[in-house]
C-alpha cells in the first residue's frame, strides 16, 4: 500500500507493515510486524483486509481472521470465525468462489468456524486469543461446526475427526 503526503506534502510511503529501526549509515534493521498479520506460504496476510473482504459476502455478518499452525507446514494458515446474518444460511461453495475472486489464494482462510455470536471484550473488541488457542481442534470448539479447504479441492468441507487426524499426521500438503 503506497501512501501519499505522510510526513510532508508530495512524499510517498510504502506501508509494508514492518517495524524497523534506524541503525545509522543508511541502514534499517527489522524489529517486528505491526498490526494483526500472519505469514503463510511466504506472504504476509493482513487479518483486517481479509475480514473486510469476507464481510462483503452477502450472508456473512461478521468475520474474525487469525493465523493457526498446521503441523508440518511453515507459517500460519488463515482461519476465520464467521457468523451469518440473522436468518441466513452460508453457502460454503459459493463463499469460496467469492473469496477466490476477491483475494489471492494464500490469503483465503483454510479453516472456517461458524459461530452464532462472536465473543467480545467489555470494549466490544473480538476475543481472538481464545479462538487462536482453540485453533481448528474439533474437541475444543464447543460443538461449533468447522470447515476446511483441503488442498486440490474447490470447496470447503466439514472438518471431521478423521480429516483432523490426517492433518495432524501431515497427510495433506497445504
Task: Describe the role of every protein-language-model region.
Residues 3-107, 117, 122-126, 130:
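AMP-binding/adenylate-forming catalytic core of the ANL superfamily
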Residues 103-126, 143-171:
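AMP-binding/adenylate-forming catalytic domain of the ANL superfamily
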Residues 113, 132-133:
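Nucleotide phosphate-binding site architecture
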Residues 133-140:
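Short arginine-rich
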